[in-house]
Amino acid sequence: MKKWLCLVLFLTTLTYSITALLPSRIRVSAAEDDLQLHAKYAVLLDGDSGRVLYGKNEDTPAPMASTTKIMSCVIALEYGLKEMTCTTSAYAASMPDVQLNAKKGETFTLNDLLYSLMLKSHNDSAVIIAENVACYYIYQVQSGIYPDTYDVLSGKDLSFVSFPSGFDTSFLQNITTEQSKILVAVFTGLMNEKAVSLGCTQTHFITPNGLDASDETGEHATTAKELAVIMSYCIQNEEFLAITQTKEHQFGSYSVSNANAFLNMYDGVLSGKTGFTGNAGYCYVCACRYDGKTFIAALLACGWPPSKTYKWQDCRTLLNWGKEHFNHEEIIGKNFPLKSITVTDGLKKELPVSIHDTCRLLLRKEDLVNVVINTPDSIAAPVFIGDIVGSVCVYVNDALLFSTPVYADACIRRTDYLYFLNQVIKSFCFIDK
């Protein structure tokens, strides 16, 4: 029934719009605000709506160094178990600085490795995490717990991976470099699938630690905008936030302190990750919440040595600009008015409708906001409560930022043969009801 209803709506929909009453309707692009940033690629994103508030070459792919690790962390949290024991392979132990200096065969909990990954950006920890979480994913698939939904195992020789007595990764200390790389590819496959699901089609992960690399598909790279989108996803995970906000973590003989200096330099910082390689330059991504506003700033190629502080300057500039120019506006409230829809061939002639969501956006006074209501002129009975009969969309400067369904608020039966026969009988028998 709902499929036919959607077809009817598609054929008969009437679209009308409401232009939001704002102080000005002059369209101003963020590019017209020259913030004099050092970064070659930069973005300031509304962390709630995903709107680009400011951009500088924000859609141009570039290497992102250790900012990669925000995705590595969230994938490990989603696919691994924090208490699981992780074994260090020879390949993982061979990673260049910055290192935890884990030894081949050494074991850690995934939880401890995540602090090493995010607080000190250890490259060996990233590979240990990747290999062990990949093993756990393979174990889950082989056990039939869930399928290889994303097909990340397809075409890979996994004959060296077996779990005869339950999940145990101690065999990793004896595998070859090529076998390690297969496991890393499984993990980065999960990273890439997550990126695609977030709409990050220009992001390509090859390494879990962000070291520069290339393969047959392209370079290890993302865009400033997509890096910000990934961060906006990561901060929805409370465990991710807890790890990245920790000042210091100790485990065994190891101690790691948070290298994200911006946590103490700027009020409201929720999370952040630095990065540097010779190819990528200095990179940084952070999330900040101020007065109910969530800003995501991402910077790529933000100088090379000795310009290590450029990223802090640029990030402060972006966040200050966002705070100064943008405020929350309620576009769609709880009692947003919608016209009833005419019903044909129904026991009632009007269908009351409503939406279930509200919309608040970060706007600047120059923004042009249009609320577009897509509902049909009429609709044929029967209609049931909860049927989707249209949509309400919010556009800011012609960009779609919000969409929500319009729902039927009543059941209306069709006036069929039995209904008319009943009416005739009532008429002849002088029956009112």
Residue ranges and their predicted role:
Residues 20-225, 231-238:
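Active-site-adjacent loops and short helices of periplasmic peptidoglycan-processing enzymes
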Residues 1-2, 110, 417:
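Structural motif marking the loop-to-transmembrane transition
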Residues 2-27:
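Sec-dependent N-terminal signal peptides of Gram-positive bacterial secreted proteins and lipoproteins
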Residues 3-4, 70, 290:
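Hydrophobic alpha-helical segments, especially transmembrane helices
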Residues 200, 218-433:
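Domain-terminus/edge residues, biased toward the C-terminal soluble/receptor-binding domains
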